[in-house]
Amino acid sequence: MRAATISRKTKETEIAVSVDLDGTGAATVSTGVGFFDHMLEQLARHSLIDISVAATGDLHIDQHHTVEDTGIALGQALRQALGDRAGIARYANALLPMDETLTRAAIDVSGRPFLVFKTEFRRAKIGEFDTELVREFFQAFVMNAGLTVHIETLYGENAHHIAESCFKALARALRLAIEVDPRQKGAIPSTKGSLAG
């Protein structure tokens, strides 16, 4: 079973995360940050990864620690659930339209963490959510999951649509990249014989 649970506690946050890579996209998410919860629900739904997140943080300061630390824990859980990454497709991409916005995401489940994020927001906030935290989440998630991810918004106006298209594009690419390919016959998809990084 490709599943994992991670608990993380610091002076700033306390987070419990569970993932099941072979799920149906079910999400149980509570971070205290409404828009972020909505984005994590989209990530689960469109990746078909079952995701459970319970996070409490120093929201009296701001949302940064809660969002970033959730990315760290979620990335660690994904990495653990992937194991040695044997048999997976490894590479995938998705082009995701959301009304006037178009975003693409490409992923390599390589064990080598790297993020390219080419997305600009015309507004600093979506409701009470700082738009700069979109990148902060992806950075934390990618680095701890051991993924190479490129996300680029080709065009868009509405900040909500731009953020949501980024999460959905990553979700769709992730869904394809972690899928077990029966033709691999359990082999690790690398001529090195390892995707440990």
Swiss-Prot record:
UniProtKB keywords: Amino-acid biosynthesis, Cytoplasm, Histidine biosynthesis, Lyase
Reactions that this protein is recorded to catalyse: D-erythro-1-(imidazol-4-yl)glycerol 3-phosphate = 3-(imidazol-4-yl)-2-oxopropyl phosphate + H2O
Coiled coil: none
Keyword Calcium: no
Locations listed in the record: Cytoplasm
MF terms in GO: imidazoleglycerol-phosphate dehydratase activity
PROSITE patterns registered for this protein in UniProt: IGP_DEHYDRATASE_1 (PS00954), IGP_DEHYDRATASE_2 (PS00955)
Originating organism: Methylocella silvestris (strain DSM 15510 / CIP 108128 / LMG 27833 / NCIMB 13906 / BL2)
Pathway assigned in UniProt: Amino-acid biosynthesis; L-histidine biosynthesis; L-histidine from 5-phospho-alpha-D-ribose 1-diphosphate: step 6/9
Gene: hisB
Major place of residence: cytoplasm
Protein name, UniProt field: Imidazoleglycerol-phosphate dehydratase
Gene3D superfamilies: Imidazole glycerol phosphate dehydratase, domain 1
Superkingdom of source: Bacteria
Family to which this protein belongs: Belongs to the imidazoleglycerol-phosphate dehydratase family.
Cellular compartments per GO CC: cytoplasm
Pfam family, one: IGPD
PANTHER family: IMIDAZOLEGLYCEROL-PHOSPHATE DEHYDRATASE, IMIDAZOLEGLYCEROL-PHOSPHATE DEHYDRATASE HIS7
Top class in the EC scheme: lyase
EC number(s) per entry: 4.2.1.19
Keyword Hydrolase: no
InterPro entries: IGPD_sf, ImidazoleglycerolP_deHydtase, ImidazoleglycerP_deHydtase_CS, Ribosomal_Su5_D2-typ_SF
Gene Ontology BP terms: L-histidine biosynthetic process
